[in-house]
C-alpha cells in the first residue's frame, strides 16, 4: 500500500490518493468524519477550528460501502479558503504581497524551506502546516476500520502536557475516562492542573507540548521482519510517527529507561498457555522484538514539542533587511497535544495494516480475513 497527500493550509482543498487497499473491505464515511472531528477538538485549539467542519468526500475506490481495489481518492474542503482565495490563487491574479512573511519563525520550516526551494516563506508554511494531517487522519481511518474488522484495536492517551504529568492506569474504567476527557487523560486531578497550565500559557503568549502514548492491541506475532533494515516494524512506525508535525522523539515499551537497568530487569520472560500460545510475563519491549511484533500490545510513546508559532514571538532576522526583528505570528493553537494523539493513532494504523498485508498478501478482504485467522489458529496451537 502507499498514499500521497496534496494541498495547502489555506488552499481550496486537501486531497489524498491511496493504492493497494484490498477490495471488499467495509468502509464507513461517517466513521472517517468522526475521526476528523476528534482531530479538531482539544482545549488549546485556535480559531481555525471554529471555521473548519472537516468532512471527507470519497471520490473513487469505494462503492456501496465496499472498497473496489481501485485507487481511493479523497478530498477535504478548507472552508477558510474563502478568506484566502485571492492570496492563494494559482494564477496571475494571486495577491503575492498580502500576508507576505519575511520574518521566519524559529522552530518552523519557514527559513530552511525558503532556502531549499528558493520560494517565499508563505509557500513553505502553507504546505508544512499541520493542516495536512487532516488528510492523513482520513487516509489512516480506512486502515483503522480494516484493522478493527480483524479484531485489532488502537487506543491512546496523553501522558503529560508541559510540566503536568498524569497518573496512568490500565483498567476499563480508566480508559473510559480517557475517552471522555477533552485532554485524553484518565487522571481527574491531573486534568484540572492542565486547564490551569493552559490558561497560564495563553496569558503569556506561549505554547505547550507533551508526551503521548499509542497502544495497538490484539496483533499477531510476526508482523515486520528482521531480515532487512527497512522491513523492521519499529523502524517503520518510528518514521511514521516522527513524520507528524512537531513530533521530536519516539520510544517503544520501556523506551529510554531501558538504558538504566540490567538486562534481567528489561527483557520479558516467555510463557506458554495451551489456549493462547506463547506470551510474555511483562511488556518492556513494547510488543516488538527483532523488528517484529511478538504478540503483546505494541506500545509507542512520542514527544511533541511546543508549537513554534508564539504570540510572544522570539527574535528572528528580516529576510529583506537582515535586521533582527520579532518572528511573524500566524493564527495557531496554544496546545494541540490531544489532536496529535488522533493523528498518531492513524499514521500508526496505516503502517500496521501495511505490515499485515506484507505478511498476508491479499487482493480481497475475504482472502485477508481468512489468512489472518488461519495464522491466528496456527500461532495458538504451535
From Swiss-Prot:
The keyword Flavoprotein applies. Belongs to the chorismate synthase family. Pathway: Metabolic intermediate biosynthesis; chorismate biosynthesis; chorismate from D-erythrose 4-phosphate and phosphoenolpyruvate: step 7/7. Keywords: Amino-acid biosynthesis, Aromatic amino acid biosynthesis, FAD, Flavoprotein, FMN, Lyase, NADP. Homotetramer. FMN binds at residues 127-129, 245-246, 290, 305-309, 331. Its cofactor is FMNH2. This is Chorismate synthase. The keyword NADP applies. This reaction introduces a second double bond into the aromatic ring system. NADP(+) binds at residues 39, 45. InterPro entries: Chorismate_synth (IPR000453), Chorismate_synth_AroC_sf (IPR035904), Chorismate_synthase_CS (IPR020541). It comes from Desulfitobacterium hafniense (strain Y51). The gene is aroC.
Amino acid at each position: 500500500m502507499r498514499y500521497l497527500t496534496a494541498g495547502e493550509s489555506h488552499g481550496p482543498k486537501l486531497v489524498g490518493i491511496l493504492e493497494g487497499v484490498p477490495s471488499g473491505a467495509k468502509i464507513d464515511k461517517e466513521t472517517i468524519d468522526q475521526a476528523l472531528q476528534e482531530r479538531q477538538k482539544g482545549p488549546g485549539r485556535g480559531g481555525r477550528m471554529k471555521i473548519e467542519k472537516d468532512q471527507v468526500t470519497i471520490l473513487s475506490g469505494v462503492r456501496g460501502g465496499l472498497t473496489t481495489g481501485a485507487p481511493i481518492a479523497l478530498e477535504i474542503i478548507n472552508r477558510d479558503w474563502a478568506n484566502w482565495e485571492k492570496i492563494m490563487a494559482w494564477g496571475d491574479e494571486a495577491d503575492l504581497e498580502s500576508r507576505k512573511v519575511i520574518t521566519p519563525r524559529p522552530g518552523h520550516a519557514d527559513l530552511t524551506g525558503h532556502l531549499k526551494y528558493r520560494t517565499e516563506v508563505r509557500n513553505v508554511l502553507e504546505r508544512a502546516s499541520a493542516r495536512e494531517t487532516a488528510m492523513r487522519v482520513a487516509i489512516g481511518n480506512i486502515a483503522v476500520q480494516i484493522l478493527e474488522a480483524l479484531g485489532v484495536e488502537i487506543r491512546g492517551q496523553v501522558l503529560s502536557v508541559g510540566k503536568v504529568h498524569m497518573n496512568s492506569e490500565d483498567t476499563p474504567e480508566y480508559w473510559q475516562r480517557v475517552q471522555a476527557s477533552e485532554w485524553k487523560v484518565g487522571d481527574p486531578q491531573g486534568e484540572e492542573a492542565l486547564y490551569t497550565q493552559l490558561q497560564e500559557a495563553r496569558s503569556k503568549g506561549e505554547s505547550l507540548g507533551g508526551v503521548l502514548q499509542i497502544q495497538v492491541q490484539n496483533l499477531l506475532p510476526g508482523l515486520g521482519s528482521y531480515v532487512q533494515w527497512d522491513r523492521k516494524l519499529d523502524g517503520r512506525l518510528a518514521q511514521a510517527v516522527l513524520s507528524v508535525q512537531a513530533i521530536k522523539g519516539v520510544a517503544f515499551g520501556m523506551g529510554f529507561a531501558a538504558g538504566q537497568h540490567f538486562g534481567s530487569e528489561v527483557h520479558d520472560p516467555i510463557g506458554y498457555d495451551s489456549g493462547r500460545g506463547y506470551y510474555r510475563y511483562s511488556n518492556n519491549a513494547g510488543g516488538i522484538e527483532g523488528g517484529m511484533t511478538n504478540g503483546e500490545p505494541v506500545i509507542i510513546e512520542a514527544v511533541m514539542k511546543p508549537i513554534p508559532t508564539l504570540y510572544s514571538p522570539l527574535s528572528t532576522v528580516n529576510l529583506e533587511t537582515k535586521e533582527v526583528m520579532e518572528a511573524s505570528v500566524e493564527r495557531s493553537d496554544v496546545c494541540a497535544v490531544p489532536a496529535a494523539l488522533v493523528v498518531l493513532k492513524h499514521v500508526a494504523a496505516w503502517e500496521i495494516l501495511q505490515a499485515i498485508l506484507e505478511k498476508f498478501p491479499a487482493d480481497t478482504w475475504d482472502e485477508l480475513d481468512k489468512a489472518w485467522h488461519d495464522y491466528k489458529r496456527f500461532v495458538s496451537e504451535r
